[in-house]
């Protein structure tokens, strides 16, 4: 199955990349943009047919490697 993990900074954590993108958009006269947040998306295939096991495995991957859970949140999507 295909796995999509979206990682983003937690609310309240300064997003310097988001601020830079926001500033760049404003300099291009996109003045109607606000609250820009930049994250990352990790996409991979997982050879697992049991959705519950897949979710447990990917959660562990996120907790151990893919996200810094002190400052980042993550969301997991399983696609059959």
Kindly label every feature range from the protein language model:
Residues 1-11, 42-44:
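Short glycine-/aliphatic-rich beta-strand segments at the starts of folded cytosolic domains
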Residues 8-9, 28-31, 61, 66:
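Residue-level signal for pocket-adjacent positions within structured domains
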Residues 9-11, 48, 80:
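Non-catalytic surface loops within mature trypsin-like serine protease
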Residues 12-28:
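Short amphipathic alpha-helix segments
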Residues 12-16, 49-56:
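Short, conserved charged micro-motifs
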Residues 29-34, 73:
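A short linear hydrophobic-aromatic micro-motif
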Residues 37-41:
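Short Gly/Ser/Thr- and Asp/Glu-enriched loop/turn motifs at secondary-structure junctions
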Residues 52-80:
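C-terminal structural segments of small proteins and small subunits
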């Amino acid at each position: 199955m295909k796995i999509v993990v979206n990682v983003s900074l937690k609310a309240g954590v300064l997003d310097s990349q988001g601020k830079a993108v926001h500033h760049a958009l404003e300099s291009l006269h996109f003045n109607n943009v606000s609250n820009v947040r930049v994250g990352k998306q990790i996409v991979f295939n997982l050879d697992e047919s049991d959705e519950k096991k897949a979710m447990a495995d990917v959660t562990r991957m996120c907790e151990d490697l893919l996200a810094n859970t002190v400052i980042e949140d993550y969301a997991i999507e399983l696609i059959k």
